[in-house]
Amino acid sequence: MHRIRTIDSDFGKKRQKKMDNHISSMIYEIKFHEFVLFILEKKMGATRRTFLTDLARKKGFRVENELSNSVTHIVAENNSGSDVLAWLKTHKMEKTTQFELLDISWLIECMKVGKPVDTKGKYQLMESRVDSANPDPTAGTLNILPPTTKTISQYACQRRTTINNHNQRFTDAFEILAKNYEFKENDDTCLTFMRAISVLKCLPFEVVSLKDTEGLPWIGDEVKGIMEEIIEDGESLEVQAVLNDERYQSFKLFTSVFGVGLKTADKWYRMGFRTLNKIRSDKTLKLTKMQKAGLCYYEDLIDCVSKAEADAVSLLVQDAVWTFLPDALVTITGGFRRGKEFGHDVDFLITSPGAEKEQEDQLLQKVTNLWKKQGLLLYCDLIESTFEDLKLPSRKIDALDHFQKCFLILKLYHHKEDKRKWEMPTGSNESEAKSWKAIRVDLVVCPYDRYAFALLGWSGSRQFERDLRRYATHEKKMMLDNHALYDKTKKIFLKAKSEEEIFAHLGLEYIQPSERNA
């Protein structure tokens, strides 16, 4: 492998030049010769650029301090394709150069996995190439072509949405407003903001002006007004008013309790409750078994579940299920399947290619009984299956499925290597130390021939699934839910052994779970 000594460059700032000189004195080993990077300082800042440059070089990338003819990839942060294009047009080049323009998320992902990842698709800001009418590499001109602008679909199932959200300042604000309208049971306005959130999350750039939203679906006047306020003032008065609203605060607190929905939250609010301590201390209040468990383990349950904790729960679930059905498929679904690092619970889909119906029906009861004997079961609500083989998919977009399922709270013990996080306070007894955490777990059992449909439905996101069903209905005259896909024109059920086959039936390009974070 070759080694490279970086070249000094004057960026016009003494401090930056000093930092670059420090970097230039280091020697790094180049592992990936087909990549020559230039990191754009625009909107990033000199300090962060220097840090990322040094980090990329340590990982084996060749990074140029100046834009030169040898550069193959330009990496930018918080810039749209038009921003980078404008910057490039003002930059003088000695000869025609061919390169790709990439978002900084590409470089960060490369450094995570320790090697270059595919540059196509979600990481591209724009495409550039030599003008075919002027192929002479010595012609002395740079021909930059704007990106291929594809119309962003109104359907989330036709958009690729990773966990890399470039517009979080807007989506965070809209999530607050959407939640407030949900609390008011104003479903239409809630959906307005949820759709706007979904569109903004799929964008590979940060919206810096309302011009960037031209042509985008579901970005109406109400949404634009709030975005304009955030762009100009850094915040929205409407959002701040919601955050300060007593009803919103109370509903948000009450619905954070496992087992509490909008009706219960409204009842408690009307009864004058504002804190959970008041609810706990009121002996006249009748609570369900689920609500009692939610209050009992509240502190644990509102604490996010990490990917490491989800993996530990996966082992627990697999061991228990395989005790009774050795050939069972146990698949983690929900946000963790979509690549999220944190969640509020852990969902699993279970099926078995060789199990009899009686074995499937008895599985969850056997598994929960085992955990009860092991002292791991803190709460269990088992819902029996009402699934019917020939029943048409539901017409309701948000309909729940009819598979057997159980909603659990499990006791997850922490490993010894994690004991520093859970060590006892000075002077406490060992018996007082809490060595476990209460975790919310959902288990769903489905017949093997419905596994693909159930997996697609339980993987989410909610908006992705809503739009997938809406697309099937309005564009394909089909009905889709967690159980089946039905063609209303041909009057037949369409079978599928995989998610890919379901997408194919719908005439859609397959979208990986990691790109369904709509």
UniProtKB/Swiss-Prot annotation:
Cofactor(s) recorded in Swiss-Prot or TrEMBL: Mg(2+)
SUPFAM superfamilies: BRCT domain (SSF52113), DNA polymerase beta, N-terminal domain-like (SSF47802), Nucleotidyltransferase (SSF81301), PsbU/PolX domain-like (SSF81585)
Region annotated Mediates interaction with DNTTIP2, chain positions: 153-518
Species, as recorded: Monodelphis domestica
Pfam families linked: BRCT (PF00533), DNA_pol_B_palm (PF14792), DNA_pol_B_thumb (PF14791), DNA_pol_lambd_f (PF10391), HHH_8 (PF14716)
Binding of a 2'-deoxyribonucleoside 5'-triphosphate, residues: 335-340, 344-347, 457-458
EC number, as in UniProt: 2.7.7.31
Catalyses which reaction(s): DNA(n) + a 2'-deoxyribonucleoside 5'-triphosphate = DNA(n+1) + diphosphate
Name of the protein in question: DNA nucleotidylexotransferase
Chain segments annotated as coiled-coil in the UniProt record: none
Annotated GO CC locations: nucleus
UniProt xrefs under PROSITE patterns: BRCT, DNA_POLYMERASE_X
GO MF terms, alphabetically ordered: DNA binding; DNA nucleotidylexotransferase activity; DNA-directed DNA polymerase activity; metal ion binding
Localisation per UniProt entry: Nucleus
Similarity section: Belongs to the DNA polymerase type-X family.
BRCT domain sequence ranges: 27-124
Record key words, sorted: Magnesium, Metal-binding, Nucleotidyltransferase, Nucleus, Terminal addition, Transferase
Enzyme class, broadest EC rank: transferase
Nuclear localization signal (motif): residue ranges: 11-17
Gene Ontology BP annotations: DNA metabolic process; DNA modification; double-strand break repair via nonhomologous end joining
Known role: Template-independent DNA polymerase which catalyzes the random addition of deoxynucleoside 5'-triphosphate to the 3'-end of a DNA initiator. One of the in vivo functions of this enzyme is the addition of nucleotides at the junction (N region) of rearranged Ig heavy chain and T-cell receptor gene segments during the maturation of B- and T-cells.
Cofactor detail note: Can also utilize other divalent cations, such as Mn(2+) and Co(2+) (in vitro).
Binding site for Mg(2+): 345, 347, 442
